[in-house]
A protein has these predicted regions:
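A transmembrane-helix-recognition feature enriched in membrane-embedded lipid enzymes
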Residues: 1-33, 51, 75-84
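Non-catalytic C-terminal accessory region of glycerolipid acyltransferases
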Residues: 4-5, 97-225
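Short, basic, glycine/proline-bearing loop/turn elements
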Residues: 13, 83-89, 118-122
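A generic structural signal for well-ordered alpha-helical segments
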Residues: 16-18, 56-58, 80-81, 105, ...
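Short gly/ser/thr-rich secondary-structure transition/capping motifs
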Residues: 18-25, 96, 155-158
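A secondary-structure boundary/capping signal
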Residues: 27, 42, 67-68, 85, ...
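Short, flexible active-site-adjacent loop segments at beta-strand->alpha-helix junctions, enriched
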Residues: 29, 43-44, 69-71, 92, ...
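Catalytic core of membrane glycerolipid acyltransferases/transacylases, capturing the structured
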Residues: 32-93
Length: 225
């Protein structure tokens, strides 16, 4: 049932985004073309899911997101998210069901997109905050490499503090980094300190990629992130 809803979402959401923003995608070939793909992203804007979904779709994959459960309560939006196979997450509840569903999706060879921070960053510079351990635990449990992905440019439109500029033509850049393979550390999955260190390492990678993208972003739009 997920495929028809995914096609509807792709037709409804992506064309307007394509027309409104000026997109640049880098290194999409680093997203696995088949088999399980665990994509970990920075989160500077509420528009990030559109940018990240766009990149994953352009790479030839159907993304499944871990999304806030509040979104599933919105009429039509919630039905579309559930119908497209997205995974609701109740932040701070300790419920392990979303991770179990993500594990099943990865085991079935799907592409799962996660935001290790768990929410949009509150840092004034727009860089990633500390990450939660779920992404690393997924990678260790399934022996799946983490594919880091970062975006820059959409936060000026809609960030944590609220909606911003809707000026058309704003560049939105998305870049994919080299995969992070944690398979050799599989046995450390029960070592919480080790998992926290690996999570900190993941966030360092996402931060470095974000800084690189930010520093190359057009200066004319320097207010964006």
């Amino acid at each position: 049932m997920a495929q028809p809803w995914f096609q509807v979402a792709k037709v409804v959401a992506l064309p307007p985004a394509w027309l409104w923003f000026r997109w640049r995608f880098e290194h999409l070939e680093l997203i696995p073309a088949r088999g399980p793909a665990l994509v970990a992203c920075n989160h500077a804007s509420y528009l990030d899911p559109i940018a990240n979904a766009y990149a994953v779709v352009k790479a030839g994959r159907r993304p499944r997101f871990l999304a806030k459960d509040d979104l599933f309560d919105i009429p039509l939006v919630g039905r579309a998210l559930a119908g497209a196979g997205q995974i609701p997450v109740s932040r701070g509840s300790g419920d392990r069901t979303p991770l179990a569903r993500a594990e099943r999706a990865l085991a079935a060879g799907e592409a799962v997109v996660v935001y290790p921070e768990g929410t949009v960053t509150t840092r004034p510079d727009g860089l990633p905050m500390a990450g939660k351990t779920g992404t690393v635990r997924l990678a260790l449990a399934l022996r799946v490499p983490i594919t880091p992905m970062v975006s820059w440019g959409s936060a000026a439109v809609w960030q944590k503090s609220g909606p911003g500029s809707l000026k058309p033509g704003r560049p939105v850049w998305v870049s994919v980094g080299a995969p992070i393979d944690l398979a050799a550390d599989h046995d450390a999955i029960l070592d919480f300190d080790a998992v926290r260190r690996m999570t900190a390492d993941l966030m360092e990678v996402l931060t470095a990629l974000t800084i690189d993208l930010r520093d190359r972003y057009p200066k004319r739009w320097a207010d964006a992130r």
